[in-house]
Amino acid sequence: MNKNLEANRNRTLSEGIHKNIKVRAPKIDKTAISPYDRYCDGYGMPGAYGNGYVSVLKVSVGTVKKTDDILLDGIVSYDRAEINDAYVGQINMLTASSFCGVAGQVWGHDLATHDSIANDEIKPLYELKQFDGTPLKVYDAKPLLEAGIELFGTEKNRRFTTAPGAHVICANKSATAYRPKENRPLKEGEAYGVWSFIALSLSNDRDHCADLFIEDAGLWTKNDNPEDLKKFLEDHRKAVTWSVVECGRDSHVVFERTYIGFAYVIMKPGEIGNALTCAPYVTLARDAVPSEGFPSLNRISLSQWLDDMNFDSLVNPSKK
Protein backbone atom coordinates (compact mmCIF):
# COMPACT_ATOMS: atom_id res chain seq x y z
CA MET A 1 0.00 0.00 0.00
CA ASN A 2 1.30 3.46 -0.93
CA LYS A 3 1.34 5.19 2.48
CA ASN A 4 1.11 8.67 0.96
CA LEU A 5 -1.91 7.63 -1.08
CA GLU A 6 -3.48 6.04 2.00
CA ALA A 7 -2.94 9.27 3.96
CA ASN A 8 -4.60 11.28 1.21
CA ARG A 9 -7.60 8.97 1.19
CA ASN A 10 -8.16 9.49 4.90
CA ARG A 11 -9.69 12.78 5.94
CA THR A 12 -10.68 14.87 8.94
CA LEU A 13 -14.22 16.20 9.20
CA SER A 14 -15.42 19.05 11.36
CA GLU A 15 -18.46 18.35 13.52
CA GLY A 16 -18.47 21.76 15.16
CA ILE A 17 -16.16 24.21 16.90
CA HIS A 18 -13.06 22.40 18.20
CA LYS A 19 -14.69 19.05 17.38
CA ASN A 20 -13.12 17.04 14.58
CA ILE A 21 -13.39 13.37 13.72
CA LYS A 22 -11.09 11.16 11.69
CA VAL A 23 -12.79 9.34 8.84
CA ARG A 24 -10.96 6.43 7.25
CA ALA A 25 -11.62 5.98 3.57
CA PRO A 26 -12.69 2.42 2.73
CA LYS A 27 -10.16 0.21 0.97
CA ILE A 28 -12.95 -1.38 -1.05
CA ASP A 29 -15.18 0.43 -3.52
CA LYS A 30 -18.53 0.65 -1.75
CA THR A 31 -20.25 2.80 -4.35
CA ALA A 32 -23.73 1.41 -4.96
CA ILE A 33 -25.78 3.24 -7.61
CA SER A 34 -28.55 1.54 -9.56
CA PRO A 35 -29.18 2.02 -13.30
CA TYR A 36 -32.54 3.68 -12.52
CA ASP A 37 -33.17 7.33 -11.74
CA ARG A 38 -36.04 6.80 -9.30
CA TYR A 39 -35.71 3.14 -8.33
CA CYS A 40 -33.30 1.24 -6.15
CA ASP A 41 -32.30 -2.17 -7.50
CA GLY A 42 -31.16 -5.46 -6.05
CA TYR A 43 -27.45 -5.96 -5.44
CA GLY A 44 -25.69 -7.83 -8.23
CA MET A 45 -28.14 -6.86 -10.94
CA PRO A 46 -26.79 -5.62 -14.31
CA GLY A 47 -26.10 -1.95 -14.92
CA ALA A 48 -25.14 -0.86 -11.42
CA TYR A 49 -22.27 1.57 -10.87
CA GLY A 50 -19.81 0.52 -8.19
CA ASN A 51 -18.92 -2.63 -6.33
CA GLY A 52 -20.92 -1.95 -3.19
CA TYR A 53 -24.38 -2.40 -1.77
CA VAL A 54 -26.62 -0.84 0.86
CA SER A 55 -28.40 -2.78 3.60
CA VAL A 56 -31.79 -1.42 4.69
CA LEU A 57 -33.66 -2.74 7.74
CA LYS A 58 -37.37 -3.57 7.95
CA VAL A 59 -39.76 -5.45 10.27
CA SER A 60 -43.49 -5.43 9.51
CA VAL A 61 -46.71 -7.39 9.88
CA GLY A 62 -49.75 -7.99 7.68
CA THR A 63 -53.15 -9.63 8.14
CA VAL A 64 -56.00 -10.89 5.97
CA LYS A 65 -59.41 -12.40 6.66
CA LYS A 66 -59.25 -16.16 6.15
CA THR A 67 -60.86 -17.63 3.04
CA ASP A 68 -61.18 -21.27 2.00
CA ASP A 69 -57.64 -21.27 0.52
CA ILE A 70 -55.01 -20.97 3.23
CA LEU A 71 -52.14 -20.89 0.72
CA LEU A 72 -53.55 -17.78 -0.97
CA ASP A 73 -54.27 -16.25 2.43
CA GLY A 74 -50.62 -16.71 3.33
CA ILE A 75 -49.54 -15.03 0.10
CA VAL A 76 -51.76 -12.00 0.73
CA SER A 77 -50.74 -11.59 4.38
CA TYR A 78 -47.06 -11.79 3.36
CA ASP A 79 -47.65 -9.23 0.60
CA ARG A 80 -49.24 -6.88 3.12
CA ALA A 81 -46.27 -7.20 5.43
CA GLU A 82 -44.02 -6.27 2.49
CA ILE A 83 -45.97 -3.09 1.74
CA ASN A 84 -46.49 -1.91 5.33
CA ASP A 85 -44.01 0.53 6.87
CA ALA A 86 -40.98 0.78 4.54
CA TYR A 87 -42.35 -0.20 1.13
CA VAL A 88 -40.72 -3.27 -0.39
CA GLY A 89 -43.67 -4.46 -2.44
CA GLN A 90 -43.60 -5.98 -5.92
CA ILE A 91 -40.17 -7.58 -5.61
CA ASN A 92 -38.79 -11.04 -6.21
CA MET A 93 -37.32 -11.56 -2.75
CA LEU A 94 -34.25 -13.80 -2.75
CA THR A 95 -32.91 -15.09 0.55
CA ALA A 96 -29.39 -14.55 1.85
CA SER A 97 -27.96 -15.81 5.11
CA SER A 98 -27.15 -13.18 6.45
CA PHE A 99 -24.30 -10.69 6.61
CA CYS A 100 -23.44 -7.16 5.51
CA GLY A 101 -19.92 -7.62 4.22
CA VAL A 102 -16.87 -5.49 3.52
CA ALA A 103 -18.46 -4.04 0.36
CA GLY A 104 -21.70 -3.16 2.15
CA GLN A 105 -22.90 -0.18 4.14
CA VAL A 106 -25.95 0.31 6.34
CA TRP A 107 -28.56 2.93 5.48
CA GLY A 108 -29.14 5.13 8.52
CA HIS A 109 -25.83 4.23 10.15
CA ASP A 110 -23.05 4.52 7.55
CA LEU A 111 -25.05 6.39 4.91
CA ALA A 112 -27.44 9.25 5.72
CA THR A 113 -26.83 8.61 9.41
CA HIS A 114 -29.96 8.94 11.51
CA ASP A 115 -29.65 12.13 13.54
CA SER A 116 -30.07 10.35 16.87
CA ILE A 117 -27.05 8.19 15.99
CA ALA A 118 -25.02 11.04 14.49
CA ASN A 119 -25.62 13.16 17.60
CA ASP A 120 -24.90 10.25 19.95
CA GLU A 121 -28.34 10.58 21.51
CA ILE A 122 -29.23 6.89 21.64
CA LYS A 123 -28.44 4.89 24.77
CA PRO A 124 -27.97 1.14 25.08
CA LEU A 125 -30.94 -0.96 26.13
CA TYR A 126 -28.55 -3.36 27.84
CA GLU A 127 -25.11 -4.96 27.45
CA LEU A 128 -23.87 -8.54 27.01
CA LYS A 129 -20.39 -9.91 27.53
CA GLN A 130 -18.73 -11.31 24.38
CA PHE A 131 -16.41 -14.30 24.21
CA ASP A 132 -13.31 -12.15 24.79
CA GLY A 133 -14.89 -10.20 27.65
CA THR A 134 -15.70 -7.14 25.53
CA PRO A 135 -19.15 -5.69 26.28
CA LEU A 136 -21.68 -5.73 23.45
CA LYS A 137 -23.92 -2.68 23.65
CA VAL A 138 -27.43 -3.33 22.36
CA TYR A 139 -29.46 -0.44 20.92
CA ASP A 140 -33.02 -0.06 19.69
CA ALA A 141 -33.12 -0.43 15.89
CA LYS A 142 -35.85 2.22 15.59
CA PRO A 143 -33.48 4.79 13.98
CA LEU A 144 -32.50 2.34 11.23
CA LEU A 145 -36.10 1.24 10.66
CA GLU A 146 -37.11 4.89 10.36
CA ALA A 147 -34.27 5.50 7.91
CA GLY A 148 -35.61 2.69 5.72
CA ILE A 149 -39.03 4.33 5.64
CA GLU A 150 -37.47 7.65 4.64
CA LEU A 151 -35.57 6.01 1.77
CA PHE A 152 -38.17 3.67 0.28
CA GLY A 153 -41.24 5.60 1.38
CA THR A 154 -44.55 3.99 2.25
CA GLU A 155 -47.22 2.39 0.10
CA LYS A 156 -49.16 5.66 -0.01
CA ASN A 157 -46.11 7.92 -0.29
CA ARG A 158 -43.47 6.11 -2.32
CA ARG A 159 -39.97 7.48 -2.76
CA PHE A 160 -36.99 5.48 -3.99
CA THR A 161 -38.61 2.07 -3.93
CA THR A 162 -37.00 -0.97 -5.45
CA ALA A 163 -37.83 -1.30 -9.14
CA PRO A 164 -41.14 -3.12 -9.68
CA GLY A 165 -40.36 -6.79 -10.22
CA ALA A 166 -36.72 -6.36 -9.18
CA HIS A 167 -34.77 -9.39 -7.99
CA VAL A 168 -33.62 -8.34 -4.53
CA ILE A 169 -31.43 -10.39 -2.22
CA CYS A 170 -32.60 -9.98 1.38
CA ALA A 171 -31.77 -11.31 4.78
CA ASN A 172 -35.29 -12.48 5.66
CA LYS A 173 -37.55 -14.72 7.68
CA SER A 174 -41.28 -14.75 8.36
CA ALA A 175 -43.96 -16.50 10.40
CA THR A 176 -47.59 -17.07 9.41
CA ALA A 177 -50.51 -18.29 11.52
CA TYR A 178 -54.31 -18.47 11.62
CA ARG A 179 -56.36 -17.29 14.57
CA PRO A 180 -59.57 -19.33 14.61
CA LYS A 181 -62.87 -17.51 14.56
CA GLU A 182 -64.29 -19.83 17.22
CA ASN A 183 -63.31 -19.54 20.88
CA ARG A 184 -61.61 -22.94 21.19
CA PRO A 185 -58.19 -24.41 21.98
CA LEU A 186 -55.59 -23.69 19.33
CA LYS A 187 -54.48 -26.41 16.96
CA GLU A 188 -50.93 -26.85 15.67
CA GLY A 189 -49.95 -23.90 13.47
CA GLU A 190 -52.65 -21.64 14.93
CA ALA A 191 -51.92 -18.64 17.13
CA TYR A 192 -53.30 -15.43 18.58
CA GLY A 193 -50.43 -13.41 17.21
CA VAL A 194 -47.24 -13.43 15.14
CA TRP A 195 -43.96 -11.61 15.64
CA SER A 196 -40.59 -10.98 14.00
CA PHE A 197 -37.17 -9.66 15.03
CA ILE A 198 -34.22 -8.16 13.23
CA ALA A 199 -30.81 -7.64 14.79
CA LEU A 200 -27.80 -6.09 13.08
CA SER A 201 -24.44 -6.36 14.81
CA LEU A 202 -21.59 -4.18 13.58
CA SER A 203 -18.12 -5.69 13.68
CA ASN A 204 -15.42 -3.75 15.48
CA ASP A 205 -13.13 -4.35 12.45
CA ARG A 206 -15.32 -3.71 9.44
CA ASP A 207 -12.39 -3.76 6.99
CA HIS A 208 -11.85 -7.44 7.69
CA CYS A 209 -15.05 -8.81 9.25
CA ALA A 210 -18.71 -8.81 8.25
CA ASP A 211 -21.62 -7.31 10.13
CA LEU A 212 -24.08 -9.98 11.26
CA PHE A 213 -27.82 -10.11 10.69
CA ILE A 214 -29.96 -12.28 12.94
CA GLU A 215 -33.63 -12.69 12.01
CA ASP A 216 -36.19 -14.44 14.16
CA ALA A 217 -39.93 -14.96 13.81
CA GLY A 218 -42.58 -16.96 15.59
CA LEU A 219 -46.12 -17.49 16.87
CA TRP A 220 -47.79 -16.21 20.04
CA THR A 221 -50.12 -18.81 21.51
CA LYS A 222 -50.64 -17.80 25.16
CA ASN A 223 -53.49 -15.27 24.91
CA ASP A 224 -54.81 -12.36 22.85
CA ASN A 225 -53.34 -9.62 25.05
CA PRO A 226 -50.97 -7.41 22.99
CA GLU A 227 -49.24 -6.11 26.12
CA ASP A 228 -48.30 -9.65 27.14
CA LEU A 229 -46.91 -10.28 23.66
CA LYS A 230 -44.92 -7.04 23.76
CA LYS A 231 -43.47 -7.96 27.17
CA PHE A 232 -42.45 -11.38 25.82
CA LEU A 233 -40.68 -9.74 22.88
CA GLU A 234 -38.88 -7.25 25.11
CA ASP A 235 -37.57 -10.18 27.15
CA HIS A 236 -36.84 -12.25 24.03
CA ARG A 237 -34.38 -9.60 22.83
CA LYS A 238 -31.77 -11.15 25.10
CA ALA A 239 -32.22 -14.55 23.47
CA VAL A 240 -31.70 -12.99 20.04
CA THR A 241 -28.57 -11.15 21.14
CA TRP A 242 -27.28 -14.30 22.87
CA SER A 243 -27.20 -15.84 19.39
CA VAL A 244 -25.20 -12.83 18.19
CA VAL A 245 -22.56 -13.45 20.84
CA GLU A 246 -22.40 -17.16 20.03
CA CYS A 247 -22.02 -16.54 16.28
CA GLY A 248 -19.25 -14.09 17.10
CA ARG A 249 -17.56 -16.75 19.21
CA ASP A 250 -17.74 -19.23 16.32
CA SER A 251 -15.81 -16.96 13.93
CA HIS A 252 -13.83 -15.04 16.58
CA VAL A 253 -15.54 -11.79 15.61
CA VAL A 254 -16.08 -9.07 18.20
CA PHE A 255 -18.98 -6.69 17.62
CA GLU A 256 -18.97 -3.00 18.41
CA ARG A 257 -22.76 -2.73 18.80
CA THR A 258 -26.07 -4.38 17.98
CA TYR A 259 -29.27 -2.76 16.75
CA ILE A 260 -32.41 -4.79 17.49
CA GLY A 261 -36.08 -4.26 16.66
CA PHE A 262 -39.31 -6.23 16.43
CA ALA A 263 -42.82 -6.12 15.00
CA TYR A 264 -45.93 -7.98 16.12
CA VAL A 265 -49.69 -8.20 15.70
CA ILE A 266 -52.58 -9.86 17.51
CA MET A 267 -54.90 -11.07 14.77
CA LYS A 268 -58.65 -10.63 14.95
CA PRO A 269 -60.64 -13.88 15.15
CA GLY A 270 -60.79 -15.41 11.68
CA GLU A 271 -57.64 -13.67 10.41
CA ILE A 272 -54.32 -14.96 9.14
CA GLY A 273 -51.28 -12.93 10.16
CA ASN A 274 -47.76 -12.70 8.84
CA ALA A 275 -44.71 -11.20 10.54
CA LEU A 276 -41.80 -10.39 8.22
CA THR A 277 -38.23 -9.43 9.00
CA CYS A 278 -36.00 -8.48 6.10
CA ALA A 279 -32.96 -6.47 5.13
CA PRO A 280 -32.78 -5.83 1.38
CA TYR A 281 -29.32 -5.49 -0.20
CA VAL A 282 -29.76 -2.72 -2.76
CA THR A 283 -28.06 -0.22 -4.99
CA LEU A 284 -29.44 3.30 -4.60
CA ALA A 285 -31.56 5.12 -7.13
CA ARG A 286 -29.51 7.71 -8.99
CA ASP A 287 -31.72 10.52 -7.75
CA ALA A 288 -31.24 9.37 -4.14
CA VAL A 289 -27.54 10.25 -4.40
CA PRO A 290 -26.76 13.91 -3.55
CA SER A 291 -25.21 16.07 -6.24
CA GLU A 292 -21.86 15.93 -4.40
CA GLY A 293 -21.68 12.22 -5.16
CA PHE A 294 -22.07 8.90 -3.39
CA PRO A 295 -19.27 9.48 -0.82
CA SER A 296 -21.16 12.51 0.51
CA LEU A 297 -23.71 10.09 2.00
CA ASN A 298 -21.02 9.09 4.52
CA ARG A 299 -20.78 12.68 5.71
CA ILE A 300 -24.40 13.75 6.06
CA SER A 301 -27.20 12.98 8.47
CA LEU A 302 -30.60 11.64 7.53
CA SER A 303 -32.18 15.07 8.04
CA GLN A 304 -29.57 16.63 5.76
CA TRP A 305 -30.35 14.00 3.13
CA LEU A 306 -34.06 14.80 3.44
CA ASP A 307 -33.24 18.48 2.95
CA ASP A 308 -31.12 17.67 -0.09
CA MET A 309 -34.00 15.63 -1.56
CA ASN A 310 -36.52 18.33 -0.57
CA PHE A 311 -38.52 15.70 1.34
CA ASP A 312 -40.58 16.11 4.48
CA SER A 313 -39.99 13.40 7.05
CA LEU A 314 -42.49 10.54 6.88
CA VAL A 315 -41.81 9.37 10.43
CA ASN A 316 -41.66 12.82 12.01
CA PRO A 317 -43.84 15.12 9.87
CA SER A 318 -42.78 18.23 11.78
CA LYS A 319 -39.24 17.82 10.43
CA LYS A 320 -37.71 17.60 6.99
Curated annotation (Swiss-Prot):
The keyword Phosphoprotein does not apply. Its EC number is 4.1.1.22. It catalyses: L-histidine + H(+) = histamine + CO2. The record marks S97, S98 as: Cleavage (non-hydrolytic). Residues 2-11 form a propeptide. Binds 1 pyruvoyl group covalently per subunit. Its cofactor is pyruvate. This is Histidine decarboxylase proenzyme. It comes from Clostridium perfringens (strain ATCC 13124 / DSM 756 / JCM 1290 / NCIMB 6125 / NCTC 8237 / Type A). The lineage of its organism: Bacteria, Bacillati, Bacillota, Clostridia, Eubacteriales.
